[in-house]
Design a protein with these regions (language model features):
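Acidic helix-start/capping segments at beta-turn-to-alpha-helix junctions
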Residues: 131-132
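Active-site-adjacent loop/helix surface patches within enzyme catalytic domains
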Residues: 2-128
Length: 132
């Protein structure tokens, strides 16, 4: 079983969605120097950005927004006929400093956590592999 901690962000649509609407997993990396600065941004109402899950460097998983709500991670997006993918996806941020701060590969703990979390979400929401 994949365990995670709750870490609240106010940045999400207040209307609940049905689980049957979830059909995509979208992965991002933070591109910020520290986990602290990334989490601060994800929780700052001025930033208007969030995600459902955040994978820390040590592999710990934080749930930022409950799955039943729409987080703000995909912006103005589309895939095939679907538009505004925030409505139909789970957003997962993996902490990585990115190209501006000496990019490094994702570490073993992060990879294990993302695989485990993804497997849980794929099974729970019946997400097709081509929708990841």
């Amino acid at each position: 079983m994949t365990k995670f901690q709750n870490f609240y962000s106010p940045n999400f649509d207040q209307i609940k969605r049905r689980s049957s609407n979830i059909k995509y997993l979208i992965y991002h990396y933070t591109g910020m120097e520290s986990e602290r600065s990334a989490l601060k941004r994800l929780c700052d109402t001025k930033s208007k950005v969030s995600c459902h899950y955040f994978i820390k460097k040590n592999g710990k998983i934080l749930q930022i927004v409950p799955d039943s709500y729409i987080s703000w991670h995909a912006g103005k997006s589309c895939w095939k006929k679907d538009k505004m993918l925030n409505k139909s996806s789970i957003g997962i941020e993996i902490h990585n400093s990115g190209h501006n701060f000496n990019y490094t590969n994702f570490n073993k703990n992060q990879i294990i956590s993302i695989k485990n979390l993804s497997n849980v979400l794929i099974k729970k929401y019946r997400i097709k592999k081509v929708m990841i």
